[in-house]
């Protein structure tokens, strides 16, 4: 081989070597760039993700606090409502008899006036009439409130009558009521005082 050919061959090898080194350097740079790009992108996404999570947590905490405050307000309102209703019930219990007492006051006034008048005039017939009128007024008041007298004719009934004694009487049948010692009353279907009676026993 000639010297010229040898020189050209050596030159070609050197050129190829330099070209290969350049190519390798470019590949290393590209790989490094891709790695940095990926790593950088991952870091960026991580920071963005943390920021997003913090915002969501903050919103949830705010909502929980709002719900808590709303619950406390509702609880306070309910407690106030309960106390108010309890007070109203206490007032109703305290003054439940006010209406009926007010109605009886008129009859009491009439009775006192009738007594005073009879003492001055000695007219006891007028006193009797006055008392009878007062009794009628009282019965009217009771009737308006749903109070009625328990019937005592016929057979003894333990639901409505309270037997305090027995009596053998030919004019009555067995277990019939012979005598009424105290009248009984019902209020709107409920026995508020049974009639006190004597029952016939043969």
Curated annotation (Swiss-Prot):
What is one term from the GO cellular component aspect held by the record? cytoplasm
InterPro entries membership: GrpE, GrpE_coiled_coil, GrpE_head
Compositional bias (Basic residues): 38-51
Pfam families this protein is in?
A: GrpE
**Family matches, as CDD domains:** GrpE (cd00446)
Q: Which UniProt keywords apply?
A: Chaperone, Cytoplasm, Stress response
Annotated compartments: Cytoplasm
| Disulphide connectivity of cysteines | none
Return the annotated region ranges for Disordered: 21-52
GO MF term set: adenyl-nucleotide exchange factor activity; protein homodimerization activity; protein-folding chaperone binding; unfolded protein binding
Q: Please tell me whether the keyword Chaperone is annotated for this protein.
A: yes
Question: What segments bear the compositional bias annotation Basic and acidic residues?
Answer: 21-37
Listed GO biological process terms: protein folding
Could you say which protein family the record assigns here?
Answer: Belongs to the GrpE family.
What is the protein's quaternary organization? Answer: Homodimer.
Descriptive protein name: Protein GrpE
Q: Which organism is it from?
A: Fusobacterium nucleatum subsp. polymorphum (Fusobacterium polymorphum)
